[in-house]
Amino acid sequence: MGIRAIVVDTAGTTTDLTFIQDVLFPYSVKALPDFLAQNQHNVLVENCICDTRDIALEPDANLARVTEILQQWVHEDRKATPLKTLQGLIWKQGYAHGEFTGHIFPDFIEAVNRFSAQKLRIYSFSSGSVEAQKLLFSHSDGGDLTEMFSGHFDTRTGNKLDKQAYANILNTISLSPKQVLFVSDVVEELKAAEAAGMMTCQMVRDSKQRTGDYRTINSFDELVID
């Protein structure tokens, strides 16, 4: 049957975690107050504000309090969908203004071209919004990589630690589990993907990283799909 699609995690796998933690997250924290104040009547932003109040169980929170909650979630690395949606919108402005480019490991840039030439489908699955993923790959250090991807998945598909999320991906891309390889640096994500029947491979870019009972690679250069 063989592998026909590769699903990749982003932070720690295709992009350096420090880029997320030291560049993107602080940028969103700093930009949130003005962004919300200027865009609070935009339908999408308004929905995110309402969802934040609901999740925080603070239905009467004013805009300043909502901003405070969202900034705290960033510091806690919460995977809340309204936060991730707002971060995607904020980062879009940052990329457009040339504040930063998307860090992508060079070995993945080479590999994504190789996989595409092999007619393999490539997907990304991240706790960051689909919009944020598209921005990362379209404004990458290696240029616009988006045409290499067949699709992207985020928290709307499910929690990355939940087997059902991977079952949902399989249903969406219409492939059997053994035709799909999931690559991530996080053991718990690999465990969930394996429970859904997917093939798995752990990316280990840091010698101090916790590993599990999975095939491991240190670079996409080592990932050969026959």
Swiss-Prot record:
What does the cofactor field's note say?
Binds 1 Mg(2+) ion per subunit.
Which Enzyme Commission number(s) are listed? 3.1.3.77
InterPro entries associated with the record: Enolase-ppase_E1, HAD-like_sf, HAD-SF_hydro_IA, HAD_sf
Q: Which GO terms describe its molecular function?
A: 2,3-diketo-5-methylthiopentyl-1-phosphate enolase activity; 2-hydroxy-3-keto-5-methylthiopentenyl-1-phosphate phosphatase activity; acireductone synthase activity; magnesium ion binding
A matching Pfam family:
Hydrolase
- Domain of life, per lineage: Bacteria
Name any cofactors this protein relies on. Mg(2+)
An example GO BP is: L-methionine salvage from methylthioadenosine
Keyword Amino-acid biosynthesis: yes or no?
yes
State the reactions this protein catalyses. 5-methylsulfanyl-2,3-dioxopentyl phosphate + H2O = 1,2-dihydroxy-5-(methylsulfanyl)pent-1-en-3-one + phosphate
TM spans, by residue?
none
HAMAP family the record matches: Salvage_MtnC
Q: Do you know which NCBIfam families this protein is assigned to? A: enolase-ppase (TIGR01691), HAD-SF-IA-v1 (TIGR01549)
What's the subunit arrangement here? Monomer.
Q: What is this protein called?
A: Enolase-phosphatase E1
